[in-house]
């Protein structure tokens, strides 16, 4: 699963996702993409599950790019532990996804295959998404 090799600090503030995505809103690599419509934290497990669903449907033909990276450590305290005594340990890694952010890109497959593969991948994610494609020049 995806996670940073090393970080400057072990734990981060929770933070909020305000407004729309500042960058990463256009297709850079593939001809088709999956774009987020609402703000949410997407975990490394969800990203991996979506990637597996997409590649499995494409039968390993074509190419997949993951445009988001889980660099936010999410902490949690063990169950039945009283409040206080410091922040919990890092439980999992997540990526903050703002509306308009392209999360996955595909290339080398027909449009109907790409559309269905991204639909299956989107089912693994906790947010509403939209299928986008490169405009023919």
UniProtKB/Swiss-Prot annotation:
Pfam families found in the cross-reference section: Ribosomal_L16
GO MF entries: rRNA binding; structural constituent of ribosome; tRNA binding
Any one GO cellular component localisation term in the record: cytosolic large ribosomal subunit
GO biological process: translation
Gene3D superfamilies: Ribosomal protein L10e/L16 (3.90.1170.10)
Keyword terms: Ribonucleoprotein, Ribosomal protein, RNA-binding, rRNA-binding, tRNA-binding
Residues spanning the signal sequence: none
Subunit comment: Part of the 50S ribosomal subunit.
Function: Binds 23S rRNA and is also seen to make contacts with the A and possibly P site tRNAs.
Xref: HAMAP family: Ribosomal_uL16
Similarity field: Belongs to the universal ribosomal protein uL16 family.
Name this polypeptide is given: Large ribosomal subunit protein uL16
Organism: Bartonella tribocorum (strain CIP 105476 / IBS 506)
Lineage of source species: Bacteria, Pseudomonadati, Pseudomonadota, Alphaproteobacteria, Hyphomicrobiales
Gene that specifies this protein: rplP
């Amino acid at each position: 699963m995806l996670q940073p090799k090393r970080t400057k600090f072990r734990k981060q503030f929770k933070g909020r996702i305000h407004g729309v995505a500042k960058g990463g809103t256009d297709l850079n690599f593939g001809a088709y993409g999956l774009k987020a419509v609402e703000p949410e934290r997407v975990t490394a497990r969800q990203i991996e599950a979506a990637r597996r669903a997409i590649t499995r449907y494409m039968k390993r033909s074509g190419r997949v790019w993951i445009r988001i990276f889980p660099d936010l450590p999410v902490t949690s305290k063990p169950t039945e532990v009283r409040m206080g005594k410091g922040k919990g340990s890092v439980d999992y890694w997540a990526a903050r996804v703002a509306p308009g952010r392209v999360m996955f890109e595909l290339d080398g497959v027909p449009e109907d295959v790409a559309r269905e593969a991204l639909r299956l991948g989107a089912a693994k994610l906790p947010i509403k998404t939209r299928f986008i494609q490169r405009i023919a020049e």
